[in-house]
From Swiss-Prot:
Primary localisation category: membrane
TM region positions: 33-53, 66-86, 101-121, 148-168, 170-190, 210-230, 243-263, 354-374, 377-397
Any one GO cellular component localisation term in the record: plasma membrane
Listed Pfam families: SDF
Name of the protein this chain belongs to: C4-dicarboxylate transport protein
SUPFAM superfamilies: Proton glutamate symport protein (SSF118215)
Its membrane topology: Multi-pass membrane protein
GO molecular function: fumarate transmembrane transporter activity; malate:proton symporter activity; succinate transmembrane transporter activity
Length: 454
């Protein structure tokens, strides 16, 4: 049984669908086509007019800010109303526990995959770079931020100083913490809290409508972000370290379609169908290099695909800090690349230490551009064998690997949501099959707008 707001959204979609039957929506009106065209235009502008391209960074930054502005209320409404509707509060603990088991298992597997591939391919072998010749100042800022991170600090940061502080700062884990506690409180109060729950459910529709409006700016944000990236770093900068970039992209591709593909098949769905289903969100992540930009859309689509709201609200926001498959592959692969490029021998003991440290430091990496680089600095600062100054080697190309990290993280969280929902018995398999098979008229968030802009 869908909540009232979801029924209203479905009514709107039915109206739109009937309009499409009378006259099919032109291809250029689809969001994924617009974003794809914007990415291509940004690449061309950044390449041929780099000075102009570097000045367009505010377009990408502004769009990310717009999306981050709405993430906190989306998470709060989804989680609080989802938990409030639970008759068995023990389910909250079970869902969270199963999600953390999944996150730990696949995060560790991703780290191992990066480690194994780096040993087999050895992308940094033969470079013979002296660490003393590298510009350590270039990575000093990242290293300083890395030193500020600690496990205790990370855990304490989950608890906000004030109730409104979490929403003001937009910290995902803090908002999730408050949302879970508030949802549990509503469930405990019971009937007396029904007016509050009804209000929150009614508020969900205009909030998602606001997301729809903001998503109309996605092509502009993707255009600005891509023009800046190419304009500042240049396509030529990729060629110097093409081996590392190619190895990382191929490894991530295989992890998604082989490892996660096997998990998907075991749980009764196709990874290819899932990727097609979330293609608009993936293009948005590609254009902005931030998985946070597509978080509201992913939560919306996972619920439409048959995952219960309570599972979606717990798994996805938590996964943005604890289930970062792409970041984990990158960390061990990049660390061994630096060691190989600087002729730093690493014993099996050193590599195991690197793996253990990475398992801890990768938790809590934010879903924003550059977070993976800071996390790598945190890992290398604890492992003395690998020179931190070696990070200067990959500083120029990190931005080009950031997209792949974000895409892999994003798909990993989509798979995790479906798997945990199935484990908990909170997945409508028929609805999932219909959504992934294209049999349902499941639209992206922007399609909620009834009257398309002329």
């Amino acid at each position: 049984m869908l909540p009232d707001w979801a029924c209203h959204v479905e009514d709107i979609m039915i109206i739109e669908h009937s309009a499409e039957v009378r006259g099919k929506t032109p291809l250029y009106r689809h969001l994924y086509v617009q974003v794809l065209a914007a990415i291509a235009a940004g690449i061309l502008l950044g390449h041929f007019y780099p000075d102009i391209g570097t000045q367009l960074k505010p377009l990408g930054d502004a769009f990310i800010r717009l999306v981050k502005m709405i993430i906190a209320p989306v998470i709060f409404l989804t989680v609080a109303t989802g938990i409030a509707g639970m008759t068995d509060l023990a389910k909250v603990g079970r869902v969270a526990g199963k999600a953390m088991i999944y996150f730990l298992a696949f995060s560790t597997l991703a780290l191992l995959v990066g480690l194994v591939v780096a040993n087999l391919v050895q992308p940094g072998a033969g470079m013979h770079i002296d660490p003393a010749s590298l510009d350590a100042k270039a990575v000093a800022t990242y290293a300083q931020k890395a030193h500020e991170q600690s496990i205790t600090g990370f855990l304490m940061n989950i608890i906000p100083t004030t109730l409104v502080g979490a929403f003001a700062e937009g910290d995902i884990l803090q908002v999730l913490f408050i949302s879970v506690l508030f949802g549990i409180s509503l469930a405990i109060v019971g009937k007396k809290a029904e007016p509050v729950v009804d209000f929150l459910q009614a508020l969900t529709l205009p909030i998602f409508r606001l997301v729809a409006i903001l998503m109309k700016a996605a092509p502009i944000g993707a255009f600005g972000a891509m023009a800046f990236t190419i304009g500042k770093y240049g396509i030529a900068s990729i060629a110097n370290l093409a081996m590392l970039i190619g190895t990382f992209y191929l490894t991530s591709f295989l992890f998604v379609f082989v490892v996660l593909g096997a998990v998907a098949r075991y749980n009764g769905f196709s990874i290819l169908s899932l990727v097609r289903y979330i293609k608009e969100e993936l293009l948005l992540v590609l254009g902005t290099s931030s998985s946070e930009a597509a978080l509201p859309g992913l939560m919306n689509k996972m619920e439409k695909a048959g995952c219960k709201r309570s599972v979606v609200g717990l798994v996805i926001p938590t996964g943005y800090s604890f289930n970062l498959d792409g970041t984990n592959i990158y960390m061990t692969l990049a660390a061994l690349f630096i060691a190989q490029a600087t002729d730093t021998p690493l014993s099996y003991g050193d590599q195991i230490l690197l793996l253990l440290v990475a398992m801890l430091s990768s938790k809590g990496a934010a879903g924003i551009t550059g977070a993976g680089f800071i996390t790598l600095a945190a890992t290398l600062s604890v492992v003395p064998s690998v020179p931190v100054a070696g990070m200067a080697l990959i500083l120029g190309i990190d931005r080009f690997m950031s997209e792949c990290r974000a895409l892999t993280n994003f798909v990993g969280n989509a798979v995790a949501t479906i798997v945990v929902a199935k484990w908990e018995g909170e997945l409508d398999q028929a609805q999932l099959s219909a959504a992934l098979g294209g049999e349902m008229q499941v639209e992206t968030i922007p399609a909620v707008v009834v009257q398309p802009a002329e």
